[in-house]
Swiss-Prot record:
Residues 190-206, 427-437, 563-581 have a biased composition (Polar residues). Residues 184-206, 313-379, 418-437, 562-586 are annotated as: Disordered. This is Microcephalin. GO terms for cellular component: centrosome; cytoplasm. Transmembrane segments: none annotated. Its main location: cytoplasm.
């Protein structure tokens, strides 16, 4: 019978916690369903009852407008316990948000985890509509398909089939079928292995003239290590072909593209060296050392040809032929241009960090080499084979090329380094001007990381992110050559722009790398540092060793101990170049200190356009001292502001009691807006106002009365918000419920010093029992604030407050805690006879 007591009820449940974060509707929904009621998920016209607690204001308004019965959760509980339909008027719902101002709307956010239900067309209406729409669209496409349109189908095995709906004697359809059949037959050979390619090259040597053009644009380039064989891709790198590897072969779509890629290697070999018998396409997979030895010798011969030492008539003839053939076959791949009869191939890579501007010229002749150098040769051979365009002939490079192999490799490890960034854009720059023939032009590779670090050590980093400026790197030039020599006027300048942070390295490693590279070390056009130096006289017997700087230890100590008091614009002179070098080597530590102590604004205020040399510019110590002084000046006003007391929290505090969380949030927002108060959880010596949501006798209200605070209603805050400032408190004082509040407040205002009441001043010494409620500390504080005296031991007291389990004396009064509370509320000592505890 209990299952049908609410059979005529259609309920809509909206039950939330008072703070609006917990939704308890599901519990009461279950109870209503158990009693036979129907529960609606939406507030529709069939709803007869709304179970409401701390719900939305819109639900409340809609229910009142429709005349639906608004009941509290107690009605549901009473119906369940009584087993009958209880009258709804006995349990009306209460809307606590009805008096809140409409301008403050708090968005509810339920913190409870939702039950995850997998969406299906059966339980989700939106998903069902979407599913039906897709089914209709699919059916429409099937019906609208013309009968004469052939269909291409992909079977489960992955093969492509041609399925015409009706047989049409059309040449187009038969051609399509024939073409698809050819593709299916060739499918097994779309990605041949290296051995298959070598076999095809042996079977059909006439294909070495590359009859099939490459269909690969220069935007579809692949990385340098995409081809596992390494034989063809590494040599294609030498020829400037950046689009090699498996990806390139897949893009072609047929075997002709693969043969075309294979032919490039043999074509270049035949064009550059007609007498070269072994071609790279004829190499076996089992002979990597032979391949590497060929590559090493060809690299050396190529260097010698670039230097203009060995060029045979056959090679000159082959160079002309290669240029003509390459321009014909490479229309879609790397950009080709020739300068004064020399071939220049430039490719623009998209992602590889190794492939840069590439130039191929000269002859290749096989010889022996080492297998372990395969990777380093592949990664660093082309940067040293670059040719720069000039009016006369190729720029000459002094010294062997293989010496700089290890140093040259590091320059291209970081694709996003400043020099590589400029190298990628260098093809848009104008060609460099002719330089004096007496100077050795460094134009074969970029600076390595260690060399860049050495220059960074002597650079002023205060202008990072600003416009470019020019600095003199005379001392760096001297360090690179291990002999302090001065450059010609204007020739020792370098443009320092877009400086990025690099890992600092030891000065010895920097010098060793620069010295090992010898005179080949230089950078291409626009690489960030382009400079020339004189050919220094190296002392005999010191091919790779370095002489330590004399007296460097003492000079470093002097540099570290130096404290300059000059301004930013002044310069400090250094007596000799060794001292300048020692200072430069130890500058990074000062940079770190400066970065730690200097703010961003101070970095921007440091001199950014200073163009003096390393020797003449202000030392790092000057900049450090000046910037730190400026930083101290910058923070002085903040320290003075703290000392002066401005910016402190307000001295007055406001305490809320008997107030739900929604109203507390409103009070906090109003206090933040109108200022003048800070919120405190409990009444203390700084409290001046106590806000009570309901006229209940709480500890905060009692402590507020005892301290002479304003005890106000919640409306005072709302009216203050309405008027935009704190208004008078008297109209909102709860004097009817707490008559002692205005009396104690008046006494507090009239007292000269700290206020202390006189209510219990004439009473004997009291002892508060540890088992009392409110807690002992709060009760003792109340008695003390009202002028009473509290003892720590019961034998000294004449009045014992609270339950006492010890031996009782006839001369001592044992009173309830309510005696203290009622006396404070009424502001008079109540008769003790009404509060005596029973004697046991």
């Amino acid at each position: 019978m209990a299952a049908h007591i609410l059979k005529d009820v259609v309920a809509y449940v909206e039950v939330w916690s008072s703070n609006g974060t917990e939704n308890y509707s599901k519990t009461f929904t279950t109870q209503l369903v158990d009693m036979g009621a129907k529960v609606s998920k939406t507030f529709n016209k069939q709803v007869t009852h709304v179970i409401f607690k701390d719900g939305y204001q819109s639900t409340w308004d809609k229910a009142q407008k429709r005349g639906v019965k608004l009941v509290s959760v107690l009605w549901v509980e009473k119906c369940r316990t009584a087993g009958a339909h209880i009258d709804e008027s006995l349990f009306p719902a209460i809307n606590t948000n009805e008096h809140l101002p409409s301008l403050i709307k708090k968005k509810r956010k339920c913190m409870q985890p939702k039950d995850f239900n997998f969406k299906t067309p059966e339980n989700d209406k939106r998903f069902q509509k979407k599913f039906e729409k897709m089914a209709k669209e699919l059916q429409r496409q099937k019906t609208s398909l013309d009968d004469d349109v052939p269909i291409l189908l992909f079977e489960s095995s992955g093969s492509l089939t041609y399925s015409p709906t009706i047989k049409i004697n059309s040449s187009h359809h038969s051609a399509m079928e024939k073409r698809l059949q050819e593709m299916k037959e060739k499918r097994e050979n779309l990605s041949p292995s290296s051995s298959q390619m070598i076999q095809q090259s042996h079977d059909n040597p006439s294909n070495s003239l590359c009859e099939a053009p490459l269909n690969i644009s220069r935007d579809t380039l692949c990385s340098d290590e995409s081809f596992a064989g390494g034989v063809h891709s590494s040599f294609d790198d030498l020829c400037g072909n950046s689009g090699c590897g498996n990806q390139e072969r897949k893009l072609g779509g047929s075997i002709n593209d693969i043969e075309s890629d294979m032919c490039i290697s043999s074509l270049v070999l035949k064009a550059n060296n007609i007498h070269s018998s072994p071609s790279f396409t004829h190499l076996d997979k089992s002979s990597p050392q032979k391949f590497l030895s060929n590559l090493s010798k060809e690299e050396i011969n190529l260097q010698r040809n670039i230097a203009g030492k060995i060029v045979t008539p056959d090679q000159k003839q082959a160079a002309g032929m290669s240029q003509e053939t390459f321009e014909e076959k490479y229309r879609l791949s790397p950009t080709l241009s020739s300068t004064k009869g020399h071939l220049l191939i430039r490719s623009r890579p998209s992602s590889s960090s190794v492939k840069r501007q590439r130039v191929s010229h000269g002859s290749h002749s096989p010889s022996k080499g080492k297998s372990k150098r395969k990777r380093s040769i592949r990664r660093s051979i082309m940067p040293r084979l670059q040719l720069c365009r000039s009016e006369g002939s190729l720029q000459h490079v002094a010294g062997p090329a293989l010496k700089a192999l290890s140093c040259g490799e590091s320059s291209y490890d970081d694709y996003f380094s400043p020099d590589n960034l400029k190298e990628r854009n260098s093809e848009n720059l104008p060609p460099t001007s002719q330089l004096p023939s007496s100077l050795a032009q460094f134009s074969c590779r970029s600076l390595s990381k260690k060399e860049r670090t050495s220059i960074f050590e002597m650079s002023d980093f205060s202008c990072i992110g600003k416009k470019t400026r020019t600095v003199d790197i005379t001392s760096f030039t001297a360090k690179t050559i291990s002999s302090p020599q001065k450059t010609a006027n204007g020739e020792g300048r370098a443009t320092l722009s877009c400086v990025t942070s690099e890992e600092s390295s030891a000065p010895g490693e920097t010098l060793r790398c620069c010295r090992q590279a010898g005179k080949e070390d230089a950078c291409p056009e626009g690489n960030g540092f382009s400079y020339t130096i004189e050919d220094p006289p190296f002392p005999k017997g010191h091919d790779g060793d370095l002489t330590p700087l004399e007296g460097s230890l003492e000079e470093v100590k002097e540099a570290v101990g130096l404290k300059s008091t000059q301004n930013k614009g002044t310069t400090s002179k250094i007596s000799n170049s060794s001292e300048g070098e020692a200072q430069s080597e130890h500058e990074p530590c000062f940079i770190v200190d400066c970065n730690m102590e200097t703010s961003t604004e101070e970095k921007e205020n440091l001199p950014g356009g200073y163009g003096g040399s390393v020797k003449n510019r202000p030392t790092r110590h000057d900049l450090l001292d000046d910037s730190c002084d400026s930083f101290k000046d910058l923070i002085k006003p903040h320290e003075e502001l703290k000392k002066s007391g401005r910016g402190k929290k307000p001295t007055r505090t406001l305490v809320m009691t008997s107030m739900p969380s929604e109203k507390q949030n409103v009070v906090i927002q109003v206090v933040d807006k109108l200022k003048g108060f800070s919120i405190a959880p409990d009444v203390c010596e700084t409290t001046t106002h106590v806000l009570s949501g309901k006229p209940l006798r709480t500890l905060n209200v009692l402590l507020g009365i005892a301290r002479g605070c304003w005890v106000l209603s919640y409306d005072w805050v709302l009216w203050s918000l309405e008027l935009g400032h704190w208004i008078s408190e008297e109209p909102f004082e709860l004097s009817n419920h707490f008559p002692a509040a205005p009396l104690c407040r008046s006494e507090c205002h009239l007292s000269a010093g700290p206020y202390r009441g006189t209510l219990f001043a004439d009473q004997p010494v009291m002892f508060v029992s540890p088992a009392s409620s409110p807690p002992v500390a709060k009760l003792c504080e109340l008695v003390h604030l009202c002028g009473g005296r509290v003892s720590q031991v019961p034998r000294q007291a004449s009045i014992v407050i609270g339950p006492y389990s010890g031996k009782k004396k006839a001369t001592v009064k044992y009173l309830s805690e309510k005696w203290v509370l009622d006396s404070i509320i009424q502001h008079k000592v109540c008769a003790s006879e009404n509060y005596l505890l029973p004697q046991r």
